[in-house]
Amino acid sequence: MSKTMAMNLLEDWCRGMEVDIHRSLLVTGIPEDCGQAEIEETLNGVLAPLGPYRVLNKIFVREENVKAALIEVGEGVNLSTIPREFPGRGGVWRVVCRDPTQDAEFLKNLNEFLDAEGRTWEDVVRLLQLNHPTLSQNQHQPPENWAEALGVLLGAVVQIIFCMDAEIRSREEARAQEAAEFEEMAAWALAAGKKVKKEPGLAAEVGSALKAETPNNWNATEDQHDPPKPLVRRAGAKSRSRRKKQKKNPKQEAVPWKKPKGINSSSTANLEDPEVGDAESMAISEPIKGSRKPCVKQEELALKKPMAKCAWKGPREPPQDAQAEAESPGGASESDQDGGHESPPKKKAMAWVSAKNPAPMRKKKKVSLGPVSYVLVDSEDGRKKPVMPKKGPGSRREASVQKAPQGQQPAEATASTSRGPRAKPEGSPRRATNESRKV
């Protein structure tokens, strides 16, 4: 067995049996078949002269196939005087003990520890007296030698070290327990924080309230598997519909044309002064041509339709000149009555025929101006034919009358062409010309 292995075995054995290592010996090399009596007989011849001793225990060492004995010596025995080897049964028996130089190193470390703690050897002795009151009886007795005194001192120091070690361990255990409690508190606080985060807040309550208010809408969206449309898209759709309504409003407002009432009241005035009518029609047509929007074209059609209707509303409110001339000739009144009973499509058909035959302009212009104007022009021409020269005021008036139908010709032509096939079989223009010749 090696020396290091023997020393480790000595330390462990002393610690296990709670024996002071400074008074313990380890004897190795004892044969396995050697008994207790033979072991004591061999040790008695070597250790008896040095002082008292006793065999504490024996152990079998498997590696060496030998026995080892733990021996405790008395307090006055000097370990340095014990031989390290002596003869025995089966060979040489070896002795292992702690080296005194190791004790010196231990004392040095102990002095440093006492200086760091602010203690002295007197304090150590006082503590030993408190722990072991029996030692106070032998306090005044001088020790037999310095080795015994040193052993007592070392025993006291070892006890102090054990007490301090126990105190340090208790403090470490208390600190470890506090750290464990702190970790438990931190884990509990973390778990509580997670629970607080998982609890529903105001947003969940508002969402549940909205869902409770409109459950059908939510169910419908869930059944269709489509998310609800965003509010921005709905606002855009509403704005588009409003824009469409704004575009449609001018078209609807342009249909009820209010100005034709004034045109109806002054229809004969327009017939008498056709140049003014041509100027107004040109003034109306120029902004219509300048505008490019489709809604303005519809306004132009709306302007033309009431003009066509106004030509038929004229006979209901005849001017003063027409009433004065209607009283004198009888044929004129008959023609007025005939004109009053005629329907608007016939007059439009006459306008269409007049647009087709531009050669006899005088006959066509009389027919296209309505019943009242036709009678007035024909009666005046009958009175003034034999007397009036070519370059008189009548010729100017006829020229102005010729200009008026030309200004109104496109509007009436469009209306007559749309209803032209209905007016062809009637043949009203020829009758009118025959009647004028008879008169």
UniProtKB/Swiss-Prot annotation:
Residues 231-249 have a biased composition (Basic residues). Residues 423-439 have a biased composition (Basic and acidic residues). InterPro entries: PNM8A_C, PNMA, PNMA_N. Residues 213-439 are annotated as: Disordered. Residues 403-419 have a biased composition (Polar residues). Transmembrane segments: none annotated. Belongs to the PNMA family. This is Paraneoplastic antigen-like protein 8A.
